[in-house]
C-alpha cells in the first residue's frame, strides 16, 4: 500500500490525467466542489489549456457540460466528488449517450478498503451509469504503476469515442499536498519525451466512414418518385448540403424541427401539418423511395408516414452505427456524415419535380400562420414565431422539450436565415434544459435564446446560477401557461384527472426567482411588449429572463383550430 507522499502522488496522477485530456481535444472542464476529487480539482485549476466552469449542483453541472460539448463539438470533462454527487450526473449522461455527445466523467472515490463498510460518503461507483457510459476504473495512485500505463489507458478509452466515458479515480488520504515539491523525475522518466511535446501519448487513427453506394446503386435509387427527410442533424453536419441534393434530384425535402432546415425557404418545413391535409397526404403517398438523414424525428405524423408507406427503397444515413427507427422498416443504413453523402455523384431523378405542388401547399400554410397566429391573440406559437423570425446564422436557439419544441415544429416561419438549433431529444426529459442552454451559450459566446416551458424552468431553477456566468447575450424565454399544458393534447379520460394529476397548475411567477440570482427580468402579456423586450435583451451582454404569461388552454385550442382549417383546405 502506497503511503509515502500520497497527496503529492495523487496530484501527479490528476495532473497527468488533465494534461492528457487537453491533448485529446478537451477544451472545457466542469467542476463541483468536493474533497475526494481534490487531486483532480487542483490539477484542473492549474491547467491553462482548459476553461474551468464551477457549479454547486452536479445535476445542472452535467447538463451544462452537455451544452458545452454540443456547441463546441469537442469532449467536455466533468469533475465530481464521491457519493451521490456522481449519481446526480446520470440524467445528463443518459442524454449524452443517446445523442452521441462525448462527456468524460472524472469521479473522485474512496479507496477499496473504505467501500461497503460504512465509511462516509462512499458508494459503489464503478458501473454506476450502467450501459450509458464506457467504464474505466483507476486504482489508487501507486509508484508501481507506470505513468505510460495510465496515459495509454486514457488514450484508448477516449480516442474516437462519441459517447460518455466514466473514469472512476480512487484516492487515499491525505488529499491536500503540504510538503515541499516532491521529486518524481525517476518515476516520470519513461514519459519524458511526452512531457516535451503536445500530442497524446498514444495516437489512434480516426475511424473512417463505411462503404459508400456505387454510381450504379445511386442511379437505381433515384429512379422514381422519392422524398428526402432531414431529421435530427447537428450544425457541424452541414445540413444545407441536403438542400442542394434535393434540388439536384428534383425531390422534395421535408424537415424536422431539429434538422437546422425547418425554416429554410427551399424545404417543406410544414410537413407535420401537411400530413393533416388530404391533398398533400395523397401527393406524398405517391412516393416510392425515401432517404432519411439522421433520426429521432419529432412529428408523430411524419413518423407514421414513414412507417405506413410501402417503400420500394428506404435508405438512412447516420454518423454512427445505431438503430434510429421505431417502426423497424427494412432499410439500407449508410454510416457517413450527411454532407459527405449529399456530395456523392448523384444523377437527376427520372421523376424530378414530381411533387412541386407540395411547395405551394407549404407556402399556403405559412400564409395561414401569418393570418391566424401572427395576427391573432397573444400566445405561445406567436411568441415562438417572433423569436424564430429574429434569428441569424451567428446565433444559437435552444428549444425546450414538451410543448415548445412541438410548437416550433408545427408552426415555425419560413425565413431567409435561422439560428443553430439545439435540443435535448435523446431521452426528451424536461430536466436540465436551462443548464444545457447555458453550456451552449458559454461554449462560443454566441448570442443564445432559450425557449422553455414553466414546468421545465421550475425543474431547473437553480441553473439560473450558471446563467449568471454567461457574458454573451442569453435570453431565457419562459412560456408560463401555469402547468404542464401539453397534456391538453393527450386523451386523458376526463378533465378532473387532467387537472389534478397531469397539468399541475402552480400559480407561480418567475420574477423573484430571477431577482434571487440577480438577473434582468421582464414579464409580458402582448406580442408588441415581447418583441420590444426580446430585441433589447439580445443586445444585452449577459443573461436576462422574459416571462411570457399566457392562458392555460390558448396553445391547445389554437393547435386544434389550425388543424381543422388545414384538414379542410
From Swiss-Prot:
InterPro entries: DHS-like_NAD/FAD-binding_dom, MenaQ_synth_MenD, MenD_middle, THDP-binding, Thiamin_PyroP_enz_TPP-bd_dom, TPP_enzyme_TPP-bd
Cofactor: Mg(2+); Mn(2+); thiamine diphosphate
Record SUPFAM superfamilies: DHS-like NAD/FAD-binding domain (SSF52467), Thiamin diphosphate-binding fold (THDP-binding) (SSF52518)
E.C. number(s) listed in UniProt: 2.2.1.9
Listed GO biological process terms: menaquinone biosynthetic process
Reactions this protein catalyses: isochorismate + 2-oxoglutarate + H(+) = 5-enolpyruvoyl-6-hydroxy-2-succinyl-cyclohex-3-ene-1-carboxylate + CO2
Pathway of action: Quinol/quinone metabolism; 1,4-dihydroxy-2-naphthoate biosynthesis; 1,4-dihydroxy-2-naphthoate from chorismate: step 2/7; Quinol/quinone metabolism; menaquinone biosynthesis
Protein keywords: Magnesium, Manganese, Menaquinone biosynthesis, Metal-binding, Thiamine pyrophosphate, Transferase
Pfam families documented for this protein: TPP_enzyme_C (PF02775), TPP_enzyme_M_2 (PF16582), TPP_enzyme_N (PF02776)
Top-rank taxon, per record: Bacteria
Cited NCBIfam families: menD (TIGR00173)
Role, per record: Catalyzes the thiamine diphosphate-dependent decarboxylation of 2-oxoglutarate and the subsequent addition of the resulting succinic semialdehyde-thiamine pyrophosphate anion to isochorismate to yield 2-succinyl-5-enolpyruvyl-6-hydroxy-3-cyclohexene-1-carboxylate (SEPHCHC).
Subunit structure: Homodimer.
Family: Belongs to the TPP enzyme family. MenD subfamily.
Protein name: 2-succinyl-5-enolpyruvyl-6-hydroxy-3-cyclohexene-1-carboxylate synthase
Gene: menD
